[in-house]
Swiss-Prot record:
DNA-binding region, residue range(s): 38-57
Disulphide bonds in the chain: none
SMART domains on file: HTH_GNTR, UTRA
Native organism: Escherichia coli (strain K12)
Gene Ontology MF terms: DNA binding; DNA-binding transcription factor activity
Gene it is expressed from: phnF
Function: Belongs to an operon involved in alkylphosphonate uptake and C-P lyase. Exact function not known. By similarity could be a transcriptional regulator.
Protein name: Probable transcriptional regulator PhnF
Length: 241
């Protein structure tokens, strides 16, 4: 029997480095982290920068990392786990995983409710609702855009003061109102141009569209309806049965 000794039958040095780095990415890195500088990695593996770059190219092609001009190599893998239950809290959940979540307000207005917002909140189309839009980041990386809708206009003076951090924590601290998730619907679609700009992602990237109803304890009508556009590569939802 003839056994091929062609060089391509064996992993090249850059393929070996890529495999080693991929293993380390799985075990030690989180989405939003950066790899050590190119010079450090080349010295560690005792190769020239050209070989090291070919190894990084393989990780880029597989979607593990992304090159950021002038910044470094950004880790994209290992999506965060997010449990979908009545008590789920975005900020606390990510803090428990050793990450640094932040949230900033992009918009706060009173506007007439569209048909789907009115249906979700159980009100008449055209009635005014409070509309807040927030951008959430994890370790500095944009994760999701969220549109929040509230039917109770007495909350408007309070919600106007919200600027950053956890919206639900702010609402509880300012008003004593605690919200509980009562329904979640998840679908998928491609990101549109403005969404790509806000989320700092390539055109047509996959997004998870998460529609959520939140209730106050003891009340039948929803207090909040939210629509979250979340990067599909950065999060995994877990549902216990």
């Amino acid at each position: 029997m003839h056994l091929s000794t062609h060089p391509t039958s064996y992993p090249t040095r850059y393929q070996e480095i890529a495999a080693k780095l991929e293993q380390e990415l799985r075990q030690h890195y989180r989405c939003g982290d950066y790899l050590p500088a190119e010079q450090q990695l080349a010295a560690r593996f005792e190769v020239n920068r050209h070989t090291l770059r070919r190894a990084i190219d393989q990780l880029v092609e597989k979607g593990w990392v992304q090159r950021r001009q002038g910044v470094g190599v950004l880790v994209l893998m290992r999506p965060f786990d997010y449990p979908l239950n009545a008590q789920a809290r975005f900020s606390q959940n990510l803090l428990d995983q050793g990450s640094h979540p932040t949230s900033e307000k992009l918009l706060s207005v009173l506007r007439p409710a569209s048909g789907h917002v009115a249906d979700a909140l159980g009100i008449t189309e055209g009635e005014n609702v409070i509309h807040l839009r927030t951008l959430r980041r994890v370790n500095g990386v944009a994760l999701c855009l969220i549109d929040h809708y509230f039917a109770d206009l007495t909350l408007w003076p309070t919600l106007q003061r919200f600027d950053s951090g956890s919206l639900h924590d702010f609402l509880r601290e300012q008003t004593g109102i605690a919200l509980r998730r009562s329904q979640t619907r998840i679908s998928a679609r491609r990101a549109q141009a403005k969404e790509c700009q806000r989320l700092e992602i390539p055109n047509m990237s996959p997004l998870l569209c998460v529609r959520t109803l939140n209730h106050r304890d003891g009340e039948s009508s929803p207090a909040e309806y939210s629509v979250s556009l979340t990067r599909a590569d950065m999060i995994e939802f877990t549902m216990e049965h």
